[in-house]
């Protein structure tokens, strides 16, 4: 019987940090392991999920959800498939505006437009960095090198082009329908 590689079975945060640092230290090895290589000739397995929205600290429910998705990605890699598991962040929405208002204790209407947008950008960037760090610390095997942000000009151009194409085909319609909404500002 072989000797255990970790004779001391107690876990420490320092040991965890060391393992994580080694895991991410060689960027080319990480990219080779988890990066998407469509020209590999392997059967493709594409994971398409709505990207998480950073409106604060990434909570345990979101971490659990992405951990389950990660299990699928890893299992498909073990089955020999080329897995596309992109890392993206949804950086559009009203929640960040509410967060800025809450943090500054000022309503959006009291700001100059550019000043408020700058505060929103700073806040969303801080939350994005924290979420990216948490995702890496959890050990998600997504393709961080191919990160996409929904407020990036290239991302917006693609989504707008798709919207225009669908509109021209008649797949987008205007209609009156009942909807649930929150009347509180």
Positions of predicted regions on the chain:
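N-terminal, positively charged nucleic-acid-binding surface of large information/translation enzymes
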Residues: 1-185
